[in-house]
Amino acid sequence: MTLRSTLARVTAKSSYWLLHDVLHRGGTSLPGKLAVSIDPNILTKIQQDFELIIVTGTNGKTLTTALITRVLQAGGYTVITNPSGSNMIQGITGTLVTAKVKPSPNGKKPIAVLEVDEANVEKIAAAMKPKMFVLTNIFRDQLDRYGEIYTTYDKIIAGIKHAPKAVVLANGDSPIFTRGDFTNERKYFGFNHIQPTDYNPTVAPINTDGILSPTDHSVLEYDFITYANLGKYFSTTDSFVRPKLNYQVTSITDLTPKYSTFSIDNTPLRIEIGGLYNIYNALTAFAVGREFNVDPEKIKTAFESNAQIFGRQEALHVDGKDVTIVLIKNPVGTNSVIDMMVTEKDDFSLLALLNANYADGIDTSWICLLYTSDAADD
């Protein structure tokens, strides 16, 4: 460790202590900004302290990262993470340089499970050479920042190419993740909860992105669709089909706004958060846990924790009313929340707030792509 990098770490930790412990503020970005300004190569110099897992994609990063963290901790690993969702270079640097690093009880290196903004994957991967990339999904999102979905995926691929030995664990239900000219080992997770006798071949709804075959750019068809462009797809023009799944949802029992019960690889599980889309997040965490040899029963226990995830379906009690706060930032995420809302059997009031801040996207035209009529009918 050089004098410059030592100074960077001391400065970052001191600023974090001041912001977090004295002023009781978040301290999620400034410590990292100070560290990078003192030593631009600080991440490269501390990479040997951790095994790194990068979690990226459009939707589900924060919850997936939190669930992976719980699962690995249940498996005996020491885990460092960015729970507030501060997922750009400054926030990630701040998380790592201020972390109190201790060896895992199992004698292995601590694992840094980091939610990473898609546009920042290349910077982080180039500096730290991750052990695993976890890819959740790619949907139309913040066009003013990312462009279309294939541009977004190209940014992720650029990061993957910096770490050719890393495993790429991707959502196999998303056709776009079958693309890419990188040489990394690929493993896939997805849904197989519908029996072949119940398949109903169909095409994705109008305006759905990411449904073109990687072989000839024809429009894919589906044996079933879970939501948006996700499902069991196949080409009608050649032999291209969804890749073989290494981990799969094998059944779904209950879908409610407050919890879901389902099975992954025939292991019964429950998560204390609603929505079909959140089963994907749990499936992702299950897959990571199994890749790190965490026993399924320990994963089950980790999922059943009712600890809330910062900013994700937070439940509050205000003036005698139960309030649930749900963050949405793009059409697919919003439509998924609408699907979850219509499973509520009791009457409820809905308040929707829209902002145009940079972090959430200054272009709000995406609200024109919502299917609110379905919710109104219910």
Residue spans for each PLM region:
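Gly/charged, well-structured mid-domain segments that form the phosphate/adenylate-handling core
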Residues: 255-257, 289-324, 328
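Cys/His-rich short segments
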Residues: 195-255
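Phosphate-binding loop of NTP-binding sites
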Residues: 3-190, 195-207, 212
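Conserved mixed alpha/beta catalytic, RNA-binding, or beta-rich assembly cores of soluble enzyme
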Residues: 330-333
